[in-house]
Each structure stands twice: as structure tokens, then as C-alpha cells.
């Protein structure tokens, strides 16, 4: 009886610890996102020298790196900027594509950093790209599998375990994304410094914006890991 009470207290303590962890990560995520939004709103109002738009920045960076087979296109929405290795396109959101600002330059250079990675066969990018089909499947089904798994854990624990494996795949993807995004920002910062498209003040602002963006990926990866551990704890706790 004492062992049972002790076990229940141990499980309750673990739950409390993870709830504190969740709240901490959620708060950190909110602060990072708020900081990033404020910086990009601020830097979107600061023009760069030469009147170069986001598209101009992207084309120049690609050409400076000897890349001529990547197209720069405009895509609808906000914060929809991305590089598509499948069709070799740098997709810039409308508020970046035609805008001459420090924020637009930073975003465009970052996305072109991915194109440079692709051209140089950067290993983490290749690994991330190879995982996309698996992650797409996992993302579509993992929450349903986990939900069913929690209701049937005492009868069919294999369902919950399968859900945890799917979630673990997305967590792994989050951590593989970190070096890819950080390296793309590093390439962007290096090019912005060498290309002469920003002055000293604007360059510092661009670096600050890119650094803040990188923090969002770190927080997202830690949040995914914390959630994974939470599901693992439920699985192991119920098995006890």
C-alpha cells in the first residue's frame, strides 16, 4: 500500500514538473514571437540603401553565388516566405517581394541562403528534404493516433506507442531544422556584409532580425521535445 502511494506521488510529481516545463516553454515562445514581430514591424519601416526590393536582394544574392537556375516568385499571404527545392523557387510573401526595407532584405537573403545550401548539397538540408514525406504523414495522423491510443492504452498500448513514434519523427525534424535555418541565416548575414547592400546601422538591424527568427526554431524544437516526453511519461506511467 505504501509502495502504491509512493508510486502515485512520484507520477503526480512528474506531471507537475512537466506542466511547469510546458508553461515555461509556452511563455518563452510567446516572448520570442512577440519580440520577432516587433522587430520586423520596426525594421519594415527602415529602407535600405539603393532602393533594392526583396526580389532585387534575392536575385542579386543568387547571382553573386553563381546560381542562375532558381526563380524568385511572389506568393500570397504573410510570413509565407520559403525556398522550394523541388522546383527551385525562392517564394517571397507580397510584403517582402516588392518592399525596400531591412526586414525584406533579411528575409529574402535568408531564403536565398537555403538555395545556396541546395546548390552546395548541404547535408542537413538533404536530410530534412528526405524526411518531408514521412513528416507529412506523421503530422496528419499523429494526434488522431495519440488520442485513440490514450483511450485504449490499457487494452492496446501499441496504438499509443505508434503515436509516440510518429510524434518523435516530427520532433527529430524540428531539431534537424535548427542547423538548416541557422546556417541559412549565417549565409545571409555573410552575404549582406560582403555585398554592400546595407550600411553599418542597417546591417546590425538585419542581423538582429535574423537572430530573433532563429530563436523561434529553437523554442519550437524544445516545445516539441517537451510534448514528446509528456506522451512518453503517460505511456510509461500507465504501464506501471
List each model region and its residues.
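Hydrophobic alpha-helical transmembrane segments of integral membrane proteins
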Residues: 22, 142, 156, 163, ...
